[in-house]
Amino acid sequence: MTTTPISNVRNFSIVAHIDHGKSTLADRLIQTTGGLQDREMKEQVLDSMDIERERGITIKAQTVRLRYKAKDGKDYILNLMDTPGHVDFAYEVSRCLAACEGALLVVDASQGVEAQTLANVYQAIDNNLEIVPVLNKVDLPAAEPDQVKQQIEDVIGIDASEAIMVSAKTGIGIPDVLEAIVTRLPPPKGDRDATLKALLVDSWYDVYLGVVVLVRVVDGVLKKGDRIRMMGTNAAYDVERVGVFTPKMVNVDELGPGEVGFITAAIKEVADTRVGDTITDDRKPITEMLPGFKPAIPVVFCGLFPVDADDFETLRGAMGKLRLNDASFSFEMETSAALGFGFRCGFLGLLHLEIIQERLSREFNLNLIATAPSVIYKMHLTDGQEIEIHNPIDMPDVVKIAEIEEPWIEATIMTPDDYLGAVLKLCQERRGTQKELTYVGSRAMAKYELPLNEVVFDFYDRLKSVSKGYASFDYHLTDYKAADLVKMQILVNNEPVDALSMLVHRSRAEGRGRAMVEKMKELIPPHMFQIPIQAAIGGKVIARETVRALRKDVTAKCYGGDITRKRKLLEKQKEGKKKMRQFGKVDIPQEAFIAALKVDS
């Protein structure tokens, strides 16, 4: 394979909102440049997980090296980085963008700019990327290219007069996209003779090769047999193979400056290769890392318990396997009196949580219960200590707490005008404060500050339902603020159920508690004695429902006769029930847990 001069290399990524067609566009580019034969083409080539293909989302970043002969007769190498579009994976997006010099901004011509498009475009602009707007789905009858062009200029502030019209599905305009990549995007810069410096873009686990690391070489040359060092973890490895994806893995002799490819080096765990790390030569390392590296920090936590206690070991193995491929997912063992043994898991966000849960049930056939998601709270104690907790069970005694702080986010919500009222009302209900509200054509863009605690529960589902699915939402963490939070417990027959305790804002506690006890009342079957179900904060009960007892008609065999005879039997029954209530155990069915945790606040 002859080395291509650096001026003929182009690294670009595709930035788009979910469902605007970037994976389909990637398919067309691969097909047009002959990366795969027609028989090997399938929908969304780059989305390798079934779940990615089904939900139409990209989770792990992927890359492809395409060879393209341009109209000027030169051969170019185009490295396409397919980035995830969802907010939970924003850090992966930022690393992908750091490895590129340009980006294609794909906007659906029938839907216009959405919230996540904005977030990703701003990241691209921050990384000084050249941006080429592409309007997709122009073949749809609902497409309004001129309005969307105007919208791109108004909202994002980049010139869209030369936006390329394409339909990725039918293949219209694909050659124009390839030409634009070559003519409008800059080549990478890099010094071949300098010391090796490369960016670790992503990594995943392969059963045969160990960890496969995706790299973008900035300076120097990376070849087989080199001894490399990861600067973030300070571990050294010997490179075993170097290659590129065309999307198939193809071995090459070396990767020069500006090139993107993969290496394997007998690395055991993905956790050893942190996304955004800098790779250098072990013999003569560079002194400073590439900017922007930060370890993945979980934001949302929840407990996962197997419905069948015998599945615990299977669950442990399954989580270990997922952890091989996803370093941002963390877990530790936890026990619950109500649910038995399970794990407390940390995720990047709600989509990440859903995906992990779905993969556990789908790939490993596990039946799971998830407890209510929670976030990390900071507790300032009266003795001057500061602790962080994410499990309501670990909360110290109320008298010891001086102040509780919770994380806040800044959310950007784009919605059609008609649903704006409902969306603003939802944000207000969730203790949000409005920062700004702007209009672009018939769409409104609202910026809100919201507590993350209110968002993790079911905010996204509610937002979709109040806006008939049209609103889009994107957020990033800002800081911690003091809050009046209380620990609410659910008591069944005067016994606290640990799996249902949660930290809520005092103003929302009664509503949330009442909804939960009502739901539990419907689902706990009647026992031989009456069962009180209570929601309590500390010693104060804020809501109560009672499941009535089943009782036998003890007076059935008395015909007529004296009332005292009947009374004696009823009193005797009453005594028995009282005794039962002291010693009886209540069986709470799994459905009751699941329903109580799904309660719509």
Swiss-Prot record:
Organism annotation: Afipia carboxidovorans (strain ATCC 49405 / DSM 1227 / KCTC 32145 / OM5)
Family: Belongs to the TRAFAC class translation factor GTPase superfamily. Classic translation factor GTPase family. LepA subfamily.
Record keywords, A-Z: Cell inner membrane, Cell membrane, GTP-binding, Hydrolase, Membrane, Nucleotide-binding, Protein biosynthesis
Single biological process term from Gene Ontology: positive regulation of translation
Disulfide bond annotation, renumbered to this chain: none
Gene of this entry: lepA
Purpose: Required for accurate and efficient protein synthesis under certain stress conditions. May act as a fidelity factor of the translation reaction, by catalyzing a one-codon backward translocation of tRNAs on improperly translocated ribosomes. Back-translocation proceeds from a post-translocation (POST) complex to a pre-translocation (PRE) complex, thus giving elongation factor G a second chance to translocate the tRNAs correctly. Binds to ribosomes in a GTP-dependent manner.
Family matches, as CDD domains: EF4_III, LepA, lepA_C
Protein name: Elongation factor 4
Domain tr-type G residue range list: 7-189
EC number(s) given by UniProt: 3.6.5.n1
Annotated GTP binding sites: D19, H20, G21, K22, S23, T24, N136, K137, V138, D139
Keyword Cell inner membrane (UniProt): yes
Cellular component GO terms, alphabetical: plasma membrane
NCBIfam families assigned: lepA, small_GTP
Compartments where located: Cell inner membrane
Record GO terms (molecular function): GTP binding; GTPase activity; guanosine tetraphosphate binding; ribosome binding; translation elongation factor activity
